[in-house]
Amino acid sequence: MEALVYTFLLVSTLGIIFFAIFFREPPXILTKKTK
């Protein structure tokens, strides 16, 4: 159970950092795919 908690915290922190950097910079590739 501890392993699951640690992995969840690790993935959540990495996801927050990734989204922070992703939304801070202009997503040119994402806009091209969506449009």
From Swiss-Prot:
Q: Which residues form a coiled coil?
A: none
Keywords noted in UniProt: Chloroplast, Membrane, Photosynthesis, Photosystem II, Plastid, Thylakoid, Transmembrane, Transmembrane helix
Bilayer-spanning residue ranges: 3-23
Does the keyword section mention Transmembrane helix? yes
Family annotation (Pfam families): PsbT (PF01405)
One GO CC annotation, please? chloroplast thylakoid membrane
State where the protein is found: Plastid, Chloroplast thylakoid membrane
GO BP terms in the entry: photosynthesis
Membrane topology, as annotated, equals: Single-pass membrane protein
Q: Key word Methyltransferase present in the record?
A: no
Family label:
Belongs to the PsbT family.
Tell me, how does this one assemble? PSII is composed of 1 copy each of membrane proteins PsbA, PsbB, PsbC, PsbD, PsbE, PsbF, PsbH, PsbI, PsbJ, PsbK, PsbL, PsbM, PsbT, PsbY, PsbZ, Psb30/Ycf12, at least 3 peripheral proteins of the oxygen-evolving complex and a large number of cofactors. It forms dimeric complexes.
Q: What does this protein do?
A: Found at the monomer-monomer interface of the photosystem II (PS II) dimer, plays a role in assembly and dimerization of PSII. PSII is a light-driven water plastoquinone oxidoreductase, using light energy to abstract electrons from H(2)O, generating a proton gradient subsequently used for ATP formation.
Its name, as the record gives it, is Photosystem II reaction center protein T
Q: Which organism is it from?
A: Asarum canadense
Give me the gene this protein comes from.
psbT
